[in-house]
């Protein structure tokens, strides 16, 4: 790895939002490059113009930058092998197509989809793997010219040598062997003139000097075809590693139907970039550290040898765990705008509220809920809070409200006064007070929350609890 500059790439086809499966691919390739002082390349594979979306491309690049996955070569930053949009690289592909045809490695194919489907059916019926039967492989120059004169537009097929074997060392799966007789001649340019993925992807990796490619194992069977193309062209091939896919709870590849969400959706919910990165760095990859790490730390601990060949199930609870770690590790300066609480908090109190609730929130919506519970009118009581108030009884809250009305509205003074007047202590003291003052039986440490409320709110909420306890007690008699 130290003999040459490691260069990896992320080569998406942006037709929609960036989702977690593709993000993990980008992350693993970036970490491999960053960890070896190499270069991370972004290449946009946009040859399918019907599905290509400029908006999706801009969104994807914005997501990568927001996550801190900066590319050293690619769109908007340039590099030694431009352009970095495949649609603009057609002139490069044309030269290699001509080379393959001239050297006998490629030939025009005039077969219709109907003819190809009939051949596949016959092969399946005979218990053979479906592959191109070679119908056009032996056409003479005269036959090709006649078909063209008739207006037939051919695809271009790569001529796979028979009786051979393609071997390569996969960085994750180990040694791989594929019989060329099982591959069959494959299309490298469609009849409409557009370049095929297998061809452009392989050629661009070589021309851009990509040394290592980490991708999903759904691409494993593409690799022998791409190695054959590069060998025929005399171009260097990268080292490939194919990792198990991320699946949903149903075991199917992760998608919207089984729990996948886009990076943008998660960001709008308040997920922090380091939460996503720390989670994904551990999906199908063993990370020795259990601590929240920055990109440099993740890169230092990344090793393709520790990537699993088995599928990895998406675990939203694990993602939320890393979100909690990320929030707890963030500064007040960062959390304040992230929480979006300023409009809900009196001037001068925002940072105090951040400090009060930061240990118990994972998302901005939770922080805003606590801002309302502290500074707005009496909060709505959940069922557990109401039960705790009724259980403590009217006498307890009359004593608490009386103490507050006498000026004991800060937490320490209030609890000492209530304890002295009622003889109640411990959980039986704190739980009813929490329920009455916040509307919930769990949450942040009570002292800073109560001290932020102010005397009027404390009195109002304790009086409400006393009334509720009295009414419920009377009904139970």
Curated annotation (Swiss-Prot):
Provide the Gene Ontology terms for cellular component. cytosol
Q: To which protein family does this belong?
A: Belongs to the class-I aminoacyl-tRNA synthetase family. Glutamate--tRNA ligase type 1 subfamily.
CDD domains (alphabetical): GluRS_core (cd00808)
- Which GO-annotated molecular functions does the record name? ATP binding; glutamate-tRNA ligase activity; tRNA binding; zinc ion binding
**Flavoprotein as UniProt keyword:** no
**What does this chain do?**
Catalyzes the attachment of glutamate to tRNA(Glu) in a two-step reaction: glutamate is first activated by ATP to form Glu-AMP and then transferred to the acceptor end of tRNA(Glu).
The record ties this protein, via Pfam families, to: Anticodon_2, tRNA-synt_1c
Known partners and oligomeric status: Monomer.
Which N-terminal residues, if any, form the signal peptide? none
Q: Please tell me where this protein is predominantly located.
A: cytoplasm
- Where does the protein end up? Cytoplasm
Which reaction equation describes what this protein catalyses?
Answer: tRNA(Glu) + L-glutamate + ATP = L-glutamyl-tRNA(Glu) + AMP + diphosphate
Source organism's superkingdom?
A: Bacteria
| Any one biological process term the GO annotation gives | glutamyl-tRNA aminoacylation
Q: Give the main EC class.
A: ligase
For this protein, the record's PANTHER family field holds:
GLUTAMATE--TRNA LIGASE, GLUTAMATE--TRNA LIGASE, MITOCHONDRIAL-RELATED
What keywords would UniProt list here?
Aminoacyl-tRNA synthetase, ATP-binding, Cytoplasm, Ligase, Nucleotide-binding, Protein biosynthesis
Motif 'KMSKS' region: where in chain: 253-257
Name recorded for this polypeptide: Glutamate--tRNA ligase 1
UniProt entry tagged with the keyword Protein biosynthesis: yes
Q: Which PROSITE patterns match?
A: AA_TRNA_LIGASE_I
What SUPFAM superfamilies does this protein's entry cite?
An anticodon-binding domain of class I aminoacyl-tRNA synthetases (SSF48163), Nucleotidylyl transferase (SSF52374)
Q: Where does ATP bind?
A: 256
Q: What is its EC number?
A: 6.1.1.17
Q: Which InterPro entries match?
A: aa-tRNA-synth_I_cd-bd, aa-tRNA-synth_I_codon-bd_sub2, aa-tRNA-synth_I_CS, aa_tRNA-synth_I_cd-bd_sf, Glu-tRNA-ligase_bac/mito, Glu/Gln-tRNA-synth, Glu/Gln-tRNA-synth_Ib_cat-dom, GluQ/Sye
Q: Where is this motif: 'HIGH' region?
A: 12-22
């Amino acid at each position: 790895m130290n003999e040459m500059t490691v260069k990896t790439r992320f080569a998406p086809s942006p037709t929609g939002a960036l989702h977690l499966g593709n993000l993990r691919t980008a992350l693993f390739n970036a970490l491999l490059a960053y960890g070896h002082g190499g270069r991370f390349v972004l290449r946009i594979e946009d040859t399918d113009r019907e599905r290509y979306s400029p908006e999706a491309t801009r969104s994807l690049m914005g997501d990568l930058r927001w996550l801190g996955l900066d590319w050293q070569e690619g769109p908007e930053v340039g590099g030694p092998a431009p352009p970095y949009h495949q649609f603009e690289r057609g002139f490069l592909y044309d030269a290699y197509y001509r080379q393959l045809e001239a050297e006998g490695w490629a030939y025009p194919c005039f077969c219709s989809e109907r003819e190809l489907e009939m051949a596949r059916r016959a092969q399946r019926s005979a218990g053979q793997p479906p592959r191109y039967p070679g119908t056009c492989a032996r056409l003479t120059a005269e036959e090709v010219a006649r078909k063209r004169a008739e207006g037939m537009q051919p695809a271009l097929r790569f001529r796979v040598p028979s009786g051979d074997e393609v071997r390569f060392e996969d960085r994750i799966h180990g040694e791989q062997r594929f019989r060329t007789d099982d591959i069959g001649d494959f299309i490298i340019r469609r009849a409409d003139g557009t370049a095929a993925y297998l061809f452009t992807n392989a050629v661009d990796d070589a021309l851009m000097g990509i040394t290592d490619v980490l991708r999903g194992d759904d691409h494993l069977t593409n690799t022998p075809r791409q190695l054959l193309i590069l060998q025929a062209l005399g171009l260097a091939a990268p080292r490939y590693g194919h990792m198990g896919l991320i699946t949903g709870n149903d075991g199917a590849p992760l998608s919207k139907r089984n729990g996948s969400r886009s990076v943008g959706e998660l960001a709008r919910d308040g997920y922090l970039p380091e939460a996503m990165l720390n989670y994904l760095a551990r999906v199908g990859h063993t990370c020795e550290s259990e601590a929240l790490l920055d990109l440099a730390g993740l890169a230092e601990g990344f090793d393709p040898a520790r990537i699993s060949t088995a599928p990895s199930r998406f675990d939203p609870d694990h993602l939320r765990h890393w979100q909690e770690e990320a929030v707890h590790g963030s500064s007040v300066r960062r959390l304040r705008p992230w929480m979006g609480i300023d409009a809900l908090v009196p001037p001068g109190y925002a940072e105090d509220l951040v400090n009060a609730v930061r240990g118990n929130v994972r998302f901005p919506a939770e922080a805003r809920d606590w801002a309302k519970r502290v500074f707005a009118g009496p909060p709505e009581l959940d069922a557990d809070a109401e039960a705790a108030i009724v259980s403590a009884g009217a006498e307890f809250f009359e004593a608490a409200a009386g103490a507050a009305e006498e000026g004991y509205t800060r937490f320490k003074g209030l609890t000492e006064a209530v304890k002295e007047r009622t003889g109640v202590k411990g959980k039986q003291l704190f739980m009813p007070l929490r329920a009455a003052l916040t509307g919930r039986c769990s949450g942040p440490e009570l002292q800073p929350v109560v001290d932020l409320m102010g005397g009027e709110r404390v009195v109002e909420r304790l009086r409400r609890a006393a009334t509720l306890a009295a009414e419920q007690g009377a009904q139970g008699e």
